[in-house]
Swiss-Prot record:
Residue numbers carrying N6-(pyridoxal phosphate)lysine: 101
Organism: Shewanella piezotolerans (strain WP3 / JCM 13877)
Keywords, sorted A to Z: Decarboxylase, Lyase, Magnesium, Metal-binding, Polyamine biosynthesis, Pyridoxal phosphate, Spermidine biosynthesis
Function of the molecule: Catalyzes the biosynthesis of agmatine from arginine.
Protein name: Biosynthetic arginine decarboxylase
SUPFAM superfamilies named in the record: PLP-binding barrel
GO molecular function, one term: metal ion binding
Annotated metabolic or biological route of this protein: Amine and polyamine biosynthesis; agmatine biosynthesis; agmatine from L-arginine: step 1/1
Family indicated by similarity: Belongs to the Orn/Lys/Arg decarboxylase class-II family. SpeA subfamily.
Cofactor(s) annotated in UniProt: Mg(2+); pyridoxal 5'-phosphate
Binding site for substrate: 286-296
Length: 637
């Protein structure tokens, strides 16, 4: 592809769309990051960043965080709602609440809070869904608006901690998820002498579409039915505490791709709000929960990995629906709250790592079968002569199907003992040779070729063995088929010569990335430059800032990766603020109740028993260094 350009590279990886202007490809073919889209010239190359960190002693893989991206996302979301409020003349304000379950890392939470430190009236609060999260939030919420929303199932201790939060000066909303919580809240509030701020999570009939759609609808795990809502109102009236009900909450699920689903959910919840107000409640806050999606594949579609709306459209729909409904039913307009954790955090983190080796198909000269070879092998050779003889486009399809059918029969006959190992090896090689020739002869401009091209690309793809654990760093790719953009960090100024799949270093066949963002949608292979030991390059996994760290699993005892916080100044210079070392082998052993200290004693006994005296100290030192070392590969050259 002699006319390859950087624009072709950008289109091939769809980077201009999924990156939201935060990541790009330079004219030199290197992947860059611009943490502040308002200053696109202030960008740095990720390849050079990774190499410099390695020189400084930070081993790959490393998770790099860009806090300026967090700041930008917070302010963009607040700005979108502020503009919508002004546009529709909405008579209340907006508050962005960050649910820390999305990423509880202290650096992340503190940077989100710091994004509005200069605002006279911060539009930022925090959400907790468990006792540990609440205890963390109680220590941090004062850095913003001091608004805390308590979701999830609650016991007496959780509720007391939330009420204590009020005594500490926070505004803590205890959202009732089930009927039994109300009694405990009222009892503990009375005992502590605190007037509680109550919220109701309503269970909507409407259910949004997506991987997390079970979060909403009548069968939802959380929330109160219409009858239960009325019962809560009755109990609060009886206790003369109806004015404590200040918040209405609903949740359609994470990653809602269709704006119509959001609009319909807000509309139904808005009716709940108006009815509660008619019953005498003084609800002040309307919490739409999560659902604001991230366009992981950049297709701006209704797929599970995308969204068919933008930030402005999201805010406009919520504000306009509530404006119209409050006017129609003559009710005051409540403060709008959203819990948009995925949107805030996904883009800010990228995993940078190295390729430790590749396995690729290289065409070989294959001799024809002997005259007395089985007819099946003769047929496969005939397929090869036809495809190498430049068969017409429609004949190529027949050749492909014939060759695949023949190979299947070869495997069956080998299992029955009717073909030798040499016969099988020859058949597999000629099949690959035919497929390779077909791959070069078929064209995606023919619709009937496209599914076969996809199959050929997958069959002939290079295998890239990448220094990371899918289960630790991209658990959603394995667990729910989430798509994450993947790109080589350099060499993109040249046309990709290969297609590849990324395999991790765990001993598990599921440790493979099997979906890739492509300019044409989602593909099963990734276009890449040729990789060799002499001209290697690094790989980046993008949009991994939401959920992946906390959901990561220590399969094969691969632990947390190294991580770094990086900023880019107004002159385009990078500053590495901090580096957090990943887990050592001793760390991960301790997680599963294996003690490195006792292992060292055992090693000493074995060394003294089996190793000659002049080698003992070196062997022991190497074992000790192994326990102190990184869980990922460090020396594979």
């Amino acid at each position: 592809m002699n006319n390859w350009s950087i624009d072709d590279a950008r289109a091939s990886y769809n980077v201009n769309y999924w990156s939201q202007g935060l990541y790009g490809i330079s004219d030199e073919g290197e992947v860059t990051v611009s943490p502040d889209p308002n200053r696109p010239d202030c960008k740095i190359g990720l390849n050079e960043l990774a190499k410099d960190m390695v020189k400084a002693g930070v081993a790959l893989p490393v998770l790099v965080r860009f806090p300026q991206i967090l700041h930008h996302r917070v302010n963009s979301l607040c700005q979108a709602f502020n503009q919508a409020i002004q546009k529709y003349k909405y008579e209340a304000d907006y508050l962005l609440v960050y649910p820390i379950k999305v990423n509880q890392q202290q650096t992340v939470v503190e940077e989100i809070l710091a994004s509005q430190v200069e605002k006279e009236v911060p539009q930022l609060g925090l959400e907790a869904g468990s006792k540990p999260e609440l205890l963390a939030v109680l220590a941090m919420a004062q850095k913003a608006s001091s608004v805390i929303i308590c979701n999830g199932y609650k016991d007496k201790e959780y509720i007391r901690l939330a009420l204590i939060g009020e005594k500490l000066g926070h505004k803590v909303y205890i959202v009732l998820e089930k009927m039994s919580e109300l009694k405990v809240v009222l009892e503990q509030a009375k005992e502590l002498g605190v007037t509680p701020r109550l919220g109701l999570r309503v269970r909507l009939a409407f259910q949004g579409k997506g991987k997390w759609q079970a979060s909403g609808g009548e069968k939802s795990k959380f929330g109160l039915s219409a009858a239960q809502v009325l019962k809560v109102i009755e109990l609060l009236q009886h206790e003369e505490m109806l004015d404590s009900l200040e918040l209405l909450h609903f949740h359609l699920g994470s990653q809602i791709a269709n704006i119509r689903d959001i609009r319909q959910g807000v509309s139904e919840a808005g009716r709940f709000y108006c009815e509660l107000m008619k019953l005498g409640a003084q609800v002040k806050c309307f919490d739409v929960g999560g659902g604001l999606a991230v366009d992981y594949d950049g297709t701006r579609s209704q797929s599970n990995n995308s969204m068919n709306y933008g930030l402005t459209e999201y805010a406009n729909n919520i504000v306009s629906v509530l404006t119209d409904m409050c006017k129609e039913y003559e009710q005051p307009m409540p403060r709008i709250i959203s819990e948009s954790g995925r949107y805030l955090t996904a883009h800010h983190a990228v995993l940078l790592t190295d390729v430790i080796g590749t396995e690729s198909y290289k065409p070989e000269t294959i001799l024809p079968p002997s005259e007395d070879a089985p007819l099946l092998l003769q047929n496969m050779w005939q397929s090869w002569t036809e495809v190498s003889g430049k068969a017409d486009q429609r004949a190529l399809i027949e050749i492909f199907h014939d060759c695949q059918s023949d190979l299947t029969e070869v495997h069956s006959l080998f299992a029955l003992g009717q073909l030798s190992l040499a016969d099988r090896a020859w058949a597999e090689q000629i099949n690959l040779r035919v497929c390779h020739e077909l791959q070069g002869s078929m064209s995606s401009k023919y619709r009937y070729h496209r599914p076969i091209i996809d199959e050929l690309n997958e069959k002939l793809a290079d295998k890239f063995f990448v220094n990371f654990s899918l289960f630790q760093s991209l658990p959603d790719a394995w667990g729910i088929d989430q798509v994450f953009p993947v790109m080589p960090l350099s060499g993109l100024d040249k046309a990709p010569e290969r297609r590849a799949v990324m395999l991790d270093i765990t001993c598990d066949s599921d440790g493979i990335v099997d979906q890739y963002v492509d300019g044409q949608g989602i593909e099963t292979t990734l276009p890449v430059p040729a990789w060799t030991q002499e001209s290697p390059y690094l790989i980046g996994f993008f949009l991994v800032g939401a959920y992946q760290e906390i959901l990561g699993d220590m399969h094969n005892l691969f632990g947390d990766t190294n991580s770094a916080v990086v900023r880019v100044d107004e002159n385009g210079r990078r500053n590495i603020d901090s580096v957090l070392e990943g887990d050592t082998v001793a760390d991960v052993l301790r997680y599963v109740n294996l003690e490195a200290v006792s292992f060292m004693r055992t090693y000493e006994e074995l060394v003294n028993k089996h190793i000659v005296a002049d080698e003992r100290s070196n062997i022991l030192e190497e074992l000790q260094l192994g326990l102190k070392g990184y869980t990922y590969l460090e020396d594979f050259s």
